[in-house]
Every structure is written in C-alpha cells, then in structure tokens.
Amino acid sequence: NWLQNTPKYVVSLLKAWWGENAKSENDFDFAHLPKLGRGFQGQGYAFLALTHAMLAGEIKGLFCFGQNPVVGGANARLIRAAMDKLDWLVVADLFEHETAGFWKRPGIDPARIPTEVFVLPACSGVEKEGSIVNSGRWVQWRNQAVKPIADSRPDLDIVDGLAKAMKRTYEKDGVFPDPIRQLAWDYGDHADPHRVARELNGSFVVDVTEKDGKEFAAGKQVPAFAQLRDDGSTMSGNWIYCGG
C-alpha cells in the first residue's frame, strides 16, 4: 500500500514551496494550499468543467501556456463562448493563435467582448534550456541551441517574472497574503532551470542519519523517493522525479 507514504510526499512538497516558513507547529503550511472542494457543480475542474465554470462566470481569468484550446478542445464553439465571459486571458506562445484571437472570429463584434487579452511572446524549444514532459511519457533535458529572437522569453522566465511581481505586490497588501508572500521562490535573477530541476528532485533540509547509518548532509540531493520524510527534513517539488 504505497499510499501510506503520502504524508512524506506532501510534507516534502510543502517544504519545497514554503521553505523555512513550513514548520511542524503550523502543519507545514498545509492551510496555505487552496481547497477546490467539489469543483464546478460537483464536477471538479477538468477541462470541460473548467469551460462551463468560465461560461457561468465563476472563473474570471485564464492562463494558457503552450496550448490552443479553441482548436484542441472538444467543443470549439463552447470554449469561445466561455472565453467571451472572462475578464482577462493570458496566452504565452510563439505566435498569436486561435485562442489568443478568439475575440475576432467571424460573425462576432469584438466591441461586445469585454475580455482583455495579453499575448506574451514565448520562445521555442530550441531557444531555451530545460526539461520537457508530455503525454507520450517522455522526460527529456534539452540544451539551448540558439538565443531567443526579439522579445521572446522562455516560459520559465515568464512565470518567474509573474511570481516575483505577485510577491512584491502581496508584501504591501492583500486579504490573505501569506501563501504568496512566504513562497520560497529563488531561482536566480534570471530563472535557472537547473535550480528548478534540483528542487523537483528534492534535497535534505537538515543533516540526516538513516536507520542503516547512512549520513546525508543538509543540501545534498535525496537519492530516491523512498527516502523522503514526513518530519520536515526533506523537500521535493515532485516525488515522482526524486532520484531521477
């Protein structure tokens, strides 16, 4: 019953996200996690339920990174109608595609669509370094072949910039600022994919001696997910990749 190890993975994840702020006395900041409940009309927030939630006005904004749901989704007409109800839409991709331009489709008056659309220029896979995973179950590390053109940036840089801006904003004010303000977000001035990969794998937070006498110094990477712990002495952004 491998599920008995869930506390080890959850605590290690919380330590990765909130670092020194995640302590045993505050349940490792478990309360910082958003609670989705049963989702939209009890259907969760899978793709179709997410679309209906936008259509109903429950979801006000949407980020689309490297995807084109207006073309790739199951019901293009429904998806476009749902996006008509958004306050804002952020698309990060190589070019303006059908999702980014949903508001100027034939037969529609753009002036009647209130959605504010932001198109962020992401660079291509050969213009950045980092790992990829996909539905074909690939896990690859790719090196940068050429520099990004014009103002395009790796999507990691885009997310990093957004996160840092949010942290600065929540330092000043907010109804419930701690989950953002206390984030352990330090991947360098320009986000380093190696730091992200190291966090995903995980490391020991303090010096640890295991039952068999093996010693691991604080900062050393955890060699396998079976060695993650639920006492706050390890951190791992994704236990599946631990030791990979």
Where are these regions (language model features)?
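Long, low-complexity segments enriched in small/aliphatic residues
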Residues: 1, 186-244
